[in-house]
Structure formats: structure tokens, C-alpha cells
């Protein structure tokens, strides 16, 4: 449901003409206050009491023991690299479309006037691809599914490099559709993989570690890397988006090739029950 809210927010901001306005921030702040007040009306949840644990365990640091396992070490390292890819598209996807307003042939196109609606196709695709994860995980296993995600990132950026809001708008739309696979086939599948590969006592900490690698370390590194690349291909105020997206596409391709050779995992379909992990 969070993704549905994401889509609605993008449509509201776009429809109200707030794309380049700080009004969207005030709107978001007000909505957060209302949601926070509503949260106090929700039923109380019983908290399961656990046996006393050390501060080390309470902080979730016990999950770092997973780095001793080569397979999990490689997995978390690539979680960082994929988190960087996510930051790239989050930071520059919409700016890419808006930048075409400096060209007469594109400035009145739907993609330039309503970039939020065009980019929301990515989240719509995300809600659909998530339904396919049980089938793909059982059929192909985590390694091939994650490789699909990396190749989807390659297509995501590659299609951006040749697309535009005019005659090439279908390529932009296709890139947004591919995003659903790029995001879900790693973020959701990766979470399920962590669920299966970890013991009960550190499972919640392991999920937190996975989130930290993708949305923490990966986002930070992706911000620095993408910022450097974008600045490198910017002359005065004009960005060479084709070259920028090609660099990011190349990054995703190299990442996929390295993952293919470095990540060792034997898929066993019998580990799945009705498409989910036992």
C-alpha cells in the first residue's frame, strides 16, 4: 500500500503543478501530522517479551556475523551496489524529463509538462511485478532473479539514454515499466533470501542489515557517484543525458557480470512451498 500512496502523491503533486514548488513539502508535512495523530487511534499491539539480551544484540549488531559467510558477504556487497542504482534513478529520473523544457520541440510535450505522471508508471509497474516474484523465485532461484534485476537496471538506464518526451516517449515508458522488475526482483526477493538464509534469533537484525546496505550505504555511495557523473557530463547548465545514462547502464551491466561469477548459490525448487520460502 505504500507504493500506492507513492503513486497518489506523485499524481497530486503533478496535477497541482507543485513539481518545482516547495508547496509539496508543506503538503507532505501536513499529511504527516495528520497521519501521526491518526496513529494514536490505532489498537494497541501486544509486545512479546523476550529474554534479556546484550546491548550488542539489542542494536542488531549480531547480524554482522553473516559477513563470515562468503555467500552472504557477496550478497550484501551487491546490495550496496544495487542501492546505488536506486539512488541514481530517484535523484535524476524526473529532472531528466524536466530538462527537455529548454528545447522548443519538447517543451510542450506531455512528459515535460507532467513528469510526475510519466515517472509514476515505474511505481505502477512495481505493484504488478511484485505479484510475479513467487513464480520467478521458485522457477529460477535467487541468483537468476537478482541477475534479472541487474539486467533490468541496465535496460532502465539504457532506454533513458535513447528516449525523449517526443518521438521517443515510448522508450521512456518502457524504461519505467522495466523499473518494476529492477526494483522488486532485488529488494523484495533479496528480503526473502535473507529470511531463508538466517537463523530465527538474528533474522530481524539481518533484515535491518539488508536495509542498511541498500537504503543506507548504497544510497550514500550512489549519491556521490551519480553526482560526480552528472557534473562531469554537464557543460554550464546543459547536461548530456545520453552519455550520463549510458554510464549508469554500463555500471549496471558490469555489476551483473561480476555478480554472475562471484555469487555462488545452488537453487533448490523444493525449498519453496507454493512459491514462498518454507
Residue positions per predicted region:
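A membrane-interface helix-boundary motif in multi-pass transporters
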Residues: 15-31, 228-252
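Juxtamembrane intracellular "pre-TM" segments in multi-pass secondary transporters
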Residues: 43-77, 102-103, 107
Amino acid at each position: 500500500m505504500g507504493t500506492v500512496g507513492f503513486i497518489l502523491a506523485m499524481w497530486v503533486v503533478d496535477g497541482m503543478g507543485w513539481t518545482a514548488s516547495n508547496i509539496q513539502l508543506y503538503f507532505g508535512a501536513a499529511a504527516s501530522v495528520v497521519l501521526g495523530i491518526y496513529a494514536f487511534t490505532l489498537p494497541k499491539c501486544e509486545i512479546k517479551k523476550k529474554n534479556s539480551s546484550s546491548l550488542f544484540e539489542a542494536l542488531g549488531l549480531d547480524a554482522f556475523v553473516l559477513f563470515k559467510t562468503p555467500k552472504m558477504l557477496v550478497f550484501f556487497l551487491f546490495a550496496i551496489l544495487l542501492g546505488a542504482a536506486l539512488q541514481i534513478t530517484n535523484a535524476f529520473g524526473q529532472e531528466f524529463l524536466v530538462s527537455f523544457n529548454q528545447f522548443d520541440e519538447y517543451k510542450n510535450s506531455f512528459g515535460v509538462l507532467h513528469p510526475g505522471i510519466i515517472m509514476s508508471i515505474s511505481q505502477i509497474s512495481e505493484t504488478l511485478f511484485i505479484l510475479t516474484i513467487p513464480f520467478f523465485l521458485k522457477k529460477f532461484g535467487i541468483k537468476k532473479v537478482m541477475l534479472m534485476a541487474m539486467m533490468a537496471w541496465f535496460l532502465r538506464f539504457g532506454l533513458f539514454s535513447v528516449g525523449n518526451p517526443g518521438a521517443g516517449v515510448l522508450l521512456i515508458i518502457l524504461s519505467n515499466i522495466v523499473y518494476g522488475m529492477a526494483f522488486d526482483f532485488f529488494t523484495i526477493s533479496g528480503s526473502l533470501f535473507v529470511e531463508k538464509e538466517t537463523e530465527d534469533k538474528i533474522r530481524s537484525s539481518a533484515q535491518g542489515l539488508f536495509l542498511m546496505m541498500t537504503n543506507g550505504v548504497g544510497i550514500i555511495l550512489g549519491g556521490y557517484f551519480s553526482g560526480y557523473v552528472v557534473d562531469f557530463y554537464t557543460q554550464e547548465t546543459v547536461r548530456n543525458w545520453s552519455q550520463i545514462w549510458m554510464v549508469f547502464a554500463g555500471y549496471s551491466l558490469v555489476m551483473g557480470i561480476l555478480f554472475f561469477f562471484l555469487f555462488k548459490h545452488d537453487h533448490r525448487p523444493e525449498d519453496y512451498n507454493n512459491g514462498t520460502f518454507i
